[in-house]
């Protein structure tokens, strides 16, 4: 496992077209879960890792809420994510996972098969004001910009996570234990901006999901995140 002792996070969740989301996960043997109105759930999460077992780095995850193909999705997928990890069928398929160090990139790709690449990532969280940027590694221009001030919110827990990924032709299910309080907020002025000229695959996927100039449904933020990324288990 990889241990993360002292970290910050800004996570924004968006309701996106379910057919467009399904097109991005079908080849991995996964199916999207639908929320109210038949929409799929996509997340953009910016992380600032200040103390981990593999060093200091920043990371951004773009992911879609899914279950393995053929699995009956819960009627209320968001509520189901409050279950214990062993009983939670709903997880996230990571589409892109840029990081700022080669060590973090190698670990994620070699152990879990995560779609990591190395590029600069800016992270600034001051109160409820956030500014985060992923740089296009090819053009060195902004690929993704998430910024704004979160709206009214309440204290709450950070959710434990289930992650699905393909590794060595198998489907891995990985549990992520989290600890530390967060603020769960309305989106306020938070917006995602995607480069309309970048040809990088991450930019193409973000645009395909309709996340250019998108407003999240809600956001989580915290300066007290701790987590444990466990070894993945191959599903039968």
What do the predicted segments below correspond to?
Residues 5-6, 77, 115, 165:
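Compositionally biased, intrinsically disordered low-complexity regions enriched in proline and serine
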Residues 23-24, 63-65, 92-94, 184, ...:
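Hydrophobic transmembrane signal anchors and adjacent membrane-proximal interface regions, especially
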Residues 36-39, 67-72, 87-92, 120-121, ...:
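Glycine-rich loops and low-complexity Gly/Arg-rich segments
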Residues 40, 58-60, 126-128:
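A generic structural signal for short beta-strands and their flanking turns/coil linkers
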Residues 40-42, 85, 107, 157:
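Short linear sequence motifs
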Residues 95-236:
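Interaction-surface and assembly-scaffold signal
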